[in-house]
Amino acid sequence: MEAYREACGLNPDVVFLQNHGVIVTAARGEECLALHEEVNARIRNYLCITAPYPAADEFITAMRAHRPEYIEHFLYTPLFPDQVVYGERVPETVAAALYIRYHIEERGWRLSMIPADLAAALVQMESEKHRQQAQF
């Protein structure tokens, strides 16, 4: 980010963090949402994903039926911090992890998982303990 700031004189509006996802910023909430949608659309276009993002519950049910190993994998090998913090309590988190894994494996790419020691450290962080208490 520092190199970008030095070269361009401002912070980037979009930042990708491995195992975290995309961070998008804008002056107003509507602009931020629109930019986030644009980023997601470009990613889907690049990956030739034509189907709309699935409803969480329906996608989880389909994965349980057709790819049960994904559910097992979800529980023990997280892709991103929200998966560690919220686990199965938030269907959107489960669906996102399964969706990402499905599309990565369909292309023959390797998954980059959060190592067990880092996942364990995450749940001990004060900020994450606070997020664990969130009600959905």
Where are each of the predicted segments found?
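Glycine-rich flexible loops
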Residues: 1-136
